[in-house]
Amino acid sequence: MRFPSASDPGLLNVIDRYVTPAAQGVGRYLHLLHGNFARDDESERTPFLQALSTAAREITDDELEILLESEWRSRLTAAWLIGFDLREHFRDVLGDLLLASQLCFAGQGYCFALARFGTDEDAQHLAVYLDRYLRRPDCPYDQRWAISALLRIDSRTGSEHAARFLHPGGLWDQWNEAQGRRRPSPPSRFIDELCAHADEDAATRDPRSAPQDAGTAP
């Protein structure tokens, strides 16, 4: 793992350009963390998303790889940029990083990107993660992000990848009960909103680039 330090100016340069640029007085990664930008007023959210979209188009694959080798702030930001620009060739890299779950918070970005890609391949990565970590109540990592991402893919493709986790008494209920929730609630669909912001940006730039719902004519 590469840690930000004076001995690694290449990493510091990429972090300064893409991870820590300030918006409303705080670094970009803090707006991406937990999808915090979605709670901002539109007057603040719009310029933030415009800058994020520009960064997603400008950053090179090599620079993304540098960020994915670093700490959680860099990995989180890289994953959001990958998802925003639909760089699907990073799919397996993000899936492997999600399953490894080496760092806090970074998995949120991996789940967002896989949800944005929205294919059966992405669903498989999310399902493998959930099959492992819903059985680990001692590891409350990114299970909520992963199930939300999986539900988004199911809703757009007509698949039912999430169903085996959500039946009464199944892994989702068991994991929630182990977290101290007596009445497990259905998983939130919050990733739908986060992806909608990216879809709207894509449609604004090029209507042909916005993902189509399953069965919708291009």
Annotate each language-model stretch with its function.
Residues 1-59, 167-218:
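N-terminal alpha-helical scaffold/docking segments in eukaryotic complex subunits
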Residues 10, 28, 47-51, 62-63, ...:
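Exposed alpha-helical structural elements
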Residues 35, 43-55, 76-86, 107-119, ...:
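Structural detector for internal amphipathic alpha-helices that build alpha-solenoid repeat scaffolds
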Residues 56-67, 87-99, 120-133, 155-166, ...:
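Amphipathic alpha-helical scaffolding segments comprising HEAT/armadillo-like alpha-solenoid repeats
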Residues 63, 71-81, 89-90:
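Short, well-structured hydrophobic secondary-structure segments
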Residues 72-73, 103-105, 136-140:
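Alpha-helix N-cap/helix-start positions at coil->helix boundaries
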Residues 81, 96-103:
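Alpha-helical transmembrane segments with an aromatic anchor "belt"
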Residues 140-149, 153, 160-182:
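Accessory, usually C-terminal, subdomains that scaffold auxiliary metal cofactors
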